[in-house]
Structures are given as C-alpha cells and as structure tokens.
Amino acid sequence: MSTNFWELLQQHQGDLTKSGRTVAEYLVQHAAEAQYLSISSLARECQVAEATVFRFCRALGFEGYHEMRIALAQANATGVLVNQQEPAPDADTATLCEHASALFMTAINGTQNALSPQAVEQAVVLLHSARQVFCMGQGGSMAAANEICARFACITNKFRAVADSHMQVMAASLMTEQDVVLFVSYSGATRDLMETLRTAKANGAKVILITHYEDSPGAKLADIVLLCGAQESPLDSGSIPIKVAVLYVAEVLVLRYILDDKPGSTEAQERTTEALAVKLL
C-alpha cells in the first residue's frame, strides 16, 4: 500500500463509525506515541474495544493492526510529524555518536522507571527454586536470551537456552512445576511465544516474561512480567538500544540472584573463573 497514512485517513473519514472516528482523532493528536502502542494499548487509550481498532484498520484498507502501525510510523518519519529522534541526513559522525548515546540512555532510563522492584524479587525467588530455567525468545530477542543464559552461567548451571521454535515447544511439553521459562519478547504477541507459553503452563511451569507491553497476550499468560521501558518503532525492529534495555533487566536479576545467595554465588563465581583461567594466553 503506497498511499500515505494521513491521506488514507482523510479519504476514508466518511466510512468510519463513531468509535472509529474516536480512534482516528487519537491518532491525529498522538501520532508519535501511537506508533509504539500495541492494539490493546491503543484500544485502552481510546476507550474502545480491540475489535473497534481492528475494524478501523480494515476500513482504511489495511490487513490488520500491524500493517496500519507500520504505515503510521512511515508517515511520521516522512511527513509533517517527523520523528524527533531521527538524526539529520547531513549529520556528522560526532553528532551520530551523541545521538546513539542519547538513545541508549533513554532506553535504560525508561526501563529503570518501568521495572518493578517487587516483580524482580518475585522472579528471583522463582529462579532460585527452579530445577531448570529455560531462556527463550525469537529473532533479536533470542540473542538477548542467549546473553542472559551466558550471564547466569557464571553462577549456576540450571540455565539453558533454547532457540528453535520447535525445540521450544518440545522443551515446554516436558516441563514440570519445578521448571521456569524466562522468555524475552518485546511485543509479547507472537504465535510461537503463545504456543510455547501455553504448553509450559499446561505442564505446571512458571513463566517470567521480559516485554514492553504489560497488557500483551503473553503477559496475560506470564506469572511475572518484567517491563522493558524502551520504545521501538515498527520501522526499527531489532534495534540495539532495545537489547541493551533487556540486558539491563537481566543484570538487575543477576545482582538480586547473587545477593540472595551470596555464599553459593561467590563459590560458583570462583569455580567458573578458575575454570576459564586456563583459556587465557
């Protein structure tokens, strides 16, 4: 679909229902913020049902919400409502360095504000009591899950990473109430995520989800939700600041985990450090 989002909205204004016009008015007034919202979040902000938002998208000619959100982000980036975080086309490298630094600091600060200390403490209780902890994700989120698994490997051998979506659901099918899933998903709304979490929950496993959307389908299945406050545009999928924000959450988990069992963690760190010493030249 090549037509600009705002042109489409103007063309189909007369086709919208009263509640559809409520959605349209919100998008006009909050265009920059709306491109980051999930369908459930947008519905809540507009005080309408998710089905109303979906019908709004179809009325404009989109297949669904995701396609509409991408079109909105494209319009924001190229139209009058320019993304203020985008560097100028002629920016020099020094400016780009400052820009990147600002993105990372914004991601970390946003996550610090969103992350619940109580949720972290509850998550660590589950991690300590677990027989096994399965670190999972898809795409760029799986890269972060691998990093989390590697970080915990210095202090415990109960963590394992499962990358393939088929292997994830297979692992979930063999879980028990002694197991924990630590799933990384920015959207909290992918088919593979939902399939794996449903299977894990059916077998009694606990679920910890690191996500940006506390009202996402995945969050509704999770026992504990750890919020990543960094915002990602649909046009910037896989951004590194998002991964850094996720790893910030992971580091808080690690620090709490260590302090809650300082003697055991210290011994484990000493043993793994000694084991790695022979690898150095």
Model-derived features with residue positions:
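HTH-adjacent hinge/linker in prokaryotic transcriptional regulators
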Residues: S2-E7, D15, T22, Q29-Y36, ...
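CheY-like receiver
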Residues: L8, Y26, A123-L126, A171
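Glycine-rich phosphate/diphosphate-binding loops that line cofactor/substrate pockets in enzymes
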Residues: Q118-A130
